[in-house]
Amino acid sequence: MAHETMSFQAEVKQLLHLMIHSLYSNKEIFLRELVSNASDAADKLRFEGLADNALYEDDPNVRIRIGYDKAARTITIDDNGIGMSRDEAIANLGTIARSGTKEFFTKLSGDQQKDAALIGQFGVGFYSGFIVADKITVETRRAGLPASEAVRWESAGEGDFTIDAIERAQRGTTITLHLREGEDELLSSHRLQSIIQKYSDHIALPILMQKEEWDQEKGEMVLKDEDETVNQASALWTRSKSEVSDEQYTQFYQHIAHDHQDPLTWTHNRVEGRSEYTQLLFVPSHAPFDMWNRDYRGGLKLYVKRVFIMDDAEQLLPQYLRFVKGVVDSADLPLNVSREILQESRDVKAIREGVTKRALSMLEELANAEEDAGKEKYKTFWGAFGQVLKEGLGEDHANRERIAKLLRFASTHGDTDAQDVSLADYVSRMKPEQSRIYYVTADAWQAAKNSPHLEVFRKKGVEVLLLTDRVDEWMLSFLQEFDGKPLASVARGDLDLGELNDEEKKAQEEAGEAIKPVVEKMKEALGDKVKEVRVTFRLTDSPSCLVADDNDMSGYLQRMLKAAGQNAPAMQPILEINPEHALVKQLKADSADFGDWCHLLFDQALLAEGGMLDDPASFVKRTNALLLSRAA
C-alpha cells in the first residue's frame, strides 16, 4: 500500500501539546507507559494464543527488549507480543478510542504528578513518548499476518502521521524514539535500567537490555553481544509475602490501577481447598474520576495458571466493592474461560465469596485500628468510598452485619459534619432507658443538624444520627436494626421515646384536648395538603413540623425520586403542632385570617425540612399580609 499521510483526531493534538509542554519535569513516565503497553501486547498474544497456537510463529518466548543508539540518538522499545495490523495502528495511534476524552481534559489539574497518572488511566500512554522525542517511528506486524502486511507509523507529533506498508519478519512492535535536543542523558544503560527498576520491576515479562561491561583499554563502558534481564520478571503475586517489599507492592498497585498515589492497604494470600487461587487485593486512597459513571468497569485482573485472561473481571467482586483493585490467579478455571462462563461457574462463585470476605477483613482491620495512622486511613477510605460500601447492605445479605459495623455517620454527638460515628459507638452511648437508634435524613448536614425534629432529643440529651448521603434512604430499607436495637426516624410516625417521655405523654394528651377544635379546623383549612393534623411533644422551639406516616415515603425520598426523574407516589404528610408555642397559642378557629396562619405553619414546616413550595408567590403574599395585620 502506498505512503499515506493522515491527520490526528482533534483530541490527540491537544494531548500532544500537553505531553510536550506540561509534563516535561516528569519525563521518566514515557518508559513506564511504553513498557506497560508492551506487557499488555504480550498478555493479548498469550490470550489469543490459547485458541490459536500458530500465533506464536515458533517463537514462544515472549519478552521486551530495550536498547539505545548514541550515534543516532534513539531509544528503542521492542516486543514480540500481538502486534498491530494497519487498521489497528491507525485506530490505536491516531485516535483516542476510549469514551470520556473530554473528561480527561477536565480532570487535568496542573499538578504534574497527578496529570501523569491520568495518562495511563485513560489508555493514552503511548503519546508520552513525545515528552522526550521529537519524532516517533513504530514498526509493527500483527501475529498471524504475513511479513508483507507489516506497517510503519511515523509522526513528529505536530498534527499528522504517515503510514507505510513494510516487510517485517518478526511479529510484535518496535517503537523508536528520536530524542529531542538536551535528552542525551537518557542514552545510558545505567539511566534506562534505573527507570525500569523504579517503575517496571514487577512486570512479569523479562525486560532485556544489551549487557554492558567496563573496557579497560578504552576506559569506558561498552555494550556486549549478549542480553541480560534487568527486571525481576516474575509475577509479583506468585512470590511469598516475605519476598515482596512494601515499595514493590505499591509499584505493582500503581501499575495495575494507573494511579500515582499509594494504596491505603492491601492483602496477599494463597487459598487452598474447594478452590485454589492466589489473591492480591488493594484499597485505593481516592475514588476514580468515573466511579459513578454508568459504564464504569470495576473488577479484578483475572489470570489462570499465570496466564492473563481479562481485565475488569466483574464477576469476582460484588458491585459494592467495585473500588477494590488487584489480581486473582486461579488454578481451577479453564484457560478458555469467557465472561459468560464466569457467570455460571461454581469455582467463580467460591472465589467471589472468598475475595469478598478478604476485602471486608481488610476494611475491618483499618476500621478497628488503634493507632492514629490506621484511623486516618479509614477516614480517608470512608470519604472516598463510604457511599459505595452502603450499597452492600442491599446487595450482600450474607455479609450485612459485617458491612453495618463498617458504616460511619455524622451525629449530634459532635458539632461537625465528619462521618466518624459507628453504630457500635452510638449504641455504647445510648441512655439506659433508650431502646432505639434514632436518625434524621436531609439534603445536607446543616439542614439535618437544624431540623426541628431534633428539638426534643436535644432537650433530653439523646444522640441522633445525621444522614445526608443520597443512598441513605435506600440503605435504611435494608438496615432496620443493629445489635438488637431497631433504627427509628425522628421524622416518621407518632414519636415514642419509651420511658424517656412518660411525663410529656400526659401533658400532650391534656394539651391536645384543650386545642382540639383548633386542630380539627386546621385539617379543614389545609384540606388534602395533609393526611392529619395533631399535637406533638417532639418540638420545643418550633411551632410546627411535618412527619411521614409509619408506612409512607419520607418527603426527602419523594424529592430525591423527583430530582432523578422518577415518579414518586403522592403522599400527604402529617402536620404536627407545638401547643406550647406562642404562634399556636394565639390561633383562634373563628378568626378571619385563621386559614392563612394554617398555611403559613405548613409552609414553614415544609421549608424547614428542605422541601420546595408549590406556590412561593402565595407564600410571600400571605406572609406579608399577616405581618401587616400584626403591625396594625
Swiss-Prot record:
UniProt xrefs under CDD domains: HATPase_Hsp90-like
Start and end residues of each stretch annotated as C: 560-632
GO cellular component terms attached to this protein's record: cytoplasm
Region (A): 1-339
Record region (B): 340-559
InterPro entries linked: HATPase_C_sf (IPR036890), Heat_shock_protein_90_CS (IPR019805), HSP90_C (IPR037196), Hsp90_fam (IPR001404), Hsp90_N (IPR020575), Ribosomal_Su5_D2-typ_SF (IPR020568)
SMART domains referenced in this protein's UniProt entry, alphabetically: HATPase_c
Gene Ontology MF annotations: ATP binding; ATP hydrolysis activity; ATP-dependent protein folding chaperone; unfolded protein binding
Keyword vocabulary terms for this entry: ATP-binding, Chaperone, Cytoplasm, Nucleotide-binding, Stress response
Domain of life the protein comes from: Bacteria
PROSITE patterns: HSP90
Subcellular location: Cytoplasm
Subunit structure of this chain's protein: Homodimer.
Cross-referenced PANTHER family: HEAT SHOCK PROTEIN 90 FAMILY MEMBER (PTHR11528)
Recorded family membership: Belongs to the heat shock protein 90 family.
UniProt function note: Molecular chaperone. Has ATPase activity.
NCBIfam families: PRK05218.1
The protein's name: Chaperone protein HtpG
Lineage of producing organism: Bacteria, Pseudomonadati, Pseudomonadota, Betaproteobacteria, Burkholderiales
